[in-house]
Amino acid sequence: MISSFRAQCAARVVREGGVIAYPTEAVWGLGCDPWNEDAVYRLLALKARPVEKGLIVVAAHIHQLDFLLEDLPDVWLERLAGTWPGPNTWLVPHQDRLPEWVTGVHDSVAVRVTDHPLVQELCYLTGPLISTSANPAGRPAARTRLRVEQYFHDELDGVLGGALGGRRNPSLIRDLVTGQVIRPA
């Protein structure tokens, strides 16, 4: 895959521990390296979001999540594969394979394989990313780059410009173990 210069620049910022904003399927997101504790805590502070709530991890391809999915039953893997890539976020048992600053106080972690081309490109360059809506707690999610800049001014390390994916609502969230819908689309 030949990556765009802007995606390469954003990926470098992420690899260096930065927090970026980027367009997702329905709203603008904030992202960083999930294994970089300082970056994740900075992102949480920008949003005024408690670490206990946990965060979503987004990937370009299901194989980027193999470290997390490798011991799951085949029926669960088939369920995931049948809904990805796409606007389906699943709560998956993390088995302590991700740090607590990503999972919060939960035994599962929210994961999604995106179908947004720019987010896929970014994840191919960086590996899985944190993906959370670009808004301070209690405010509506940003649907424009201007709103991102109004919310966060110069507190971000980068903004990857591009178009939203055209969906009206954030992704559906379901529990992989129970099948329960946690957040409707």
UniProtKB/Swiss-Prot annotation:
Recorded GO MF terms: ATP binding; double-stranded RNA binding; L-threonylcarbamoyladenylate synthase; tRNA binding
Protein localization: Cytoplasm
Annotated family: Belongs to the SUA5 family. TsaC subfamily.
Catalysed reaction equations from the record: L-threonine + hydrogencarbonate + ATP = L-threonylcarbamoyladenylate + diphosphate + H2O
GO cellular component annotations of the record: cytoplasm
Organism: Pseudomonas paraeruginosa (strain DSM 24068 / PA7) (Pseudomonas aeruginosa (strain PA7))
Entry protein name: Threonylcarbamoyl-AMP synthase
Domain YrdC-like stretches: 4-185
Cysteine pairings via disulfide bonds: none
GO BP term, pick one: regulation of translational fidelity
